[in-house]
C-alpha cells in the first residue's frame, strides 16, 4: 500500500497519524521545528516515518516522497498554509488525493469543486454532531420536582445608575411643589413650568419676573442642576449602551426565560458549530464566553443569548440558567478548563437541581484523561473532537481515486 503523507503534527495531526497507522497504512509525516518531542516520539512509536521541515517547501515535500504517495493530508490550523500547499500539490502531483483542513465550512465545497481537492473538511463541524448527541442523550427536564427555590445571585448594580436618575426625579418633584405653592400655579402648570426650567427651553408664557427673590434663586439653581443632571444622565445612558452593558442585560433576560436548554461554554470553532447545530434542531441554547467582541460571538448572538463571563464561576452559570438547563457542553480548547467547568457545573447542579441530573459533556484532547474519568464516574461524557474528525479525514484519504 502506498504511503500517506501527513503535513503537520499538532494535536489533530497526531491523531490522524495514529489513526492511519492503526489502519495498517504506511505514513510519512512532515513536522516543523516547533513540533514537540513528545509528539515526534508518539508518531514514531505508531510507525510513522518523520521528515523534518516546512511542508510548504517543495524540497521538503520531495523528501517525504509526496509525488508517489497515495494521499496528502493537510492538518495544520493555518487555513492559508493548508490552501497554499494544497494548490502546489495539485500542480505537482495531480494524481495524489488531497485532503485539507479548513475552518470555513462554507468555502470547503468551493475548494473541492473549483480546485480539484478531494476533500476540504472542518473538524469542528464534523465533531459537532457527537457533542449534540451526547448533550441530548437524556430526557428533557420538562417537569421539575417541587422544591424550595434556590436563592440565585443577582448582578451587582452600579450606584450611579440609580442615584443620578433618582436625584433628578427628586429635584423635579420638589420644584413642582415649590412652584405650585409659591406662584399659585395649578399642578399641571407647575409640571409644565418645571419642565421648561429644567430643560432650559422656557417659552416665556410663565416666568419668575415678579416672583419672590428666594423663588428666583431657586429657579436659577434649578436651571444649573437640571442641565448638569441631564448631561450626566445622558452620559450614563451612553456608557450603558456603548460599553455593551445593555446588550449583556438583554442576553441575561433572554437566558432567564429559557427552559430545558443547553449551555455551551466556549465560543471557538467547536462551540460555534455545536450552538449552530443545536439551534438548527430547534433546541434553545445559551452560550458562555469570556470575549465580548469576538467575530464568532457576533455571528452566534442573533440565534442565542451569549453570557459574557468565566464559566468556572457559579454566578455566571446561574446567569445562563444552569438550574433550568438540560445539559452543559464545555468545549474550550483547554482540557483542564473544561474539567473545571464541568466540576463547577456539577456542584451548582447538585445545589439547585434536586432530583434532576444535569448532563455534562466535555471536550477532551487527552485520551488518558478521558479513560481515567470514565473509569471512576458516569456523570461526565468526554468527547474528543480530534478523534472523531481524524476518522473522517482517514476515511476520505483512503477512498479509491
Per-segment meaning from a language model:
Residues 1-401:
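Cytosolic regulatory regions of ion transport systems
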Amino acid at each position: 500500500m502506498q504511503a500517506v503523507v501527513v503535513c503537520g503534527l499538532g494535536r489533530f495531526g497526531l491523531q490522524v497519524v495514529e489513526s492511519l497507522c492503526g489502519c495498517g497504512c504506511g505514513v510519512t509525516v512532515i513536522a516543523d521545528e516547533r513540533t514537540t518531542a513528545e509528539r515526534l516520539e508518539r508518531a514514531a512509536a505508531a510507525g510513522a516515518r518523520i521528515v523534518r521541515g516546512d511542508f510548504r517547501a517543495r524540497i521538503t515535500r520531495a523528501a517525504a516522497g509526496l509525488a508517489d504517495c497515495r494521499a496528502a493530508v493537510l492538518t495544520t490550523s493555518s487555513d492559508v498554509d493548508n490552501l497554499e500547499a494544497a494548490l502546489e500539490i495539485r500542480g505537482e502531483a495531480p494524481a495524489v488525493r488531497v485532503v485539507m483542513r479548513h475552518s470555513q465550512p462554507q468555502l470547503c465545497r468551493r475548494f473541492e469543486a473549483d480546485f480539484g481537492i478531494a476533500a476540504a473538511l472542518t473538524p469542528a463541524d464534523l465533531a459537532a454532531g457527537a457533542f449534540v448527541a451526547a448533550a441530548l442523550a437524556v430526557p428533557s427536564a420538562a417537569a421539575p420536582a417541587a422544591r424550595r427555590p434556590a436563592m440565585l445571585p443577582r448582578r451587582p448594580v452600579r450606584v450611579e445608575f440609580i442615584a443620578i436618575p433618582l436625584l433628578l426625579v427628586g429635584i423635579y418633584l420638589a420644584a413642582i411643589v415649590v412652584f405650585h405653592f409659591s406662584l399659585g400655579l395649578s399642578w399641571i402648570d407647575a409640571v409644565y413650568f418645571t419642565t421648561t426650567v429644567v430643560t432650559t427651553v422656557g417659552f416665556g408664557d410663565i416666568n419668575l419676573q415678579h416672583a419672590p427673590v428666594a423663588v428666583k434663586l431657586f429657579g436659577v439653581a434649578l436651571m444649573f442642576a437640571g442641565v448638569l443632571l441631564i448631561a450626566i444622565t445622558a452620559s450614563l445612558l451612553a456608557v450603558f449602551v456603548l460599553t455593551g452593558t445593555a446588550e449583556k442585560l438583554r442576553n441575561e433576560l433572554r437566558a432567564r426565560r429559557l427552559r430545558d436548554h443547553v449551555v455551551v461554554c466556549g465560543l471557538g470553532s467547536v462551540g460555534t458549530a455545536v450552538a449552530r447545530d443545536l439551534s438548527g434542531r430547534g433546541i434553545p441554547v445559551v452560550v458562555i464566553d469570556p470575549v465580548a467582541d469576538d467575530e464568532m460571538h457576533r455571528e452566534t448572538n442573533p440565534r442565542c443569548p451569549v453570557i459574557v463571563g468565566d464559566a468556572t464561576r457559579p454566578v455566571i452559570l446561574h446567569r445562563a440558567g444552569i438550574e433550568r438547563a438540560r445539559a452543559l457542553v464545555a468545549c474550550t480548547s483547554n482540557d483542564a478548563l473544561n474539567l473545571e467547568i464541568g466540576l463547577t457545573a456539577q456542584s451548582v447542579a447538585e445545589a439547585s437541581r434536586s432530583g434532576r441530573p444535569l448532563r455534562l459533556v466535555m471536550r477532551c484532547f487527552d485520551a488518558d484523561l478521558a479513560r481515567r474519568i470514565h473509569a471512576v464516574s458516569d456523570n461526565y461524557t468526554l468527547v474528543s473532537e480530534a478523534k472523531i474528525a481524524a476518522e473522517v479525514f482517514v476515511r476520505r484519504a483512503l477512498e479509491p481515486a
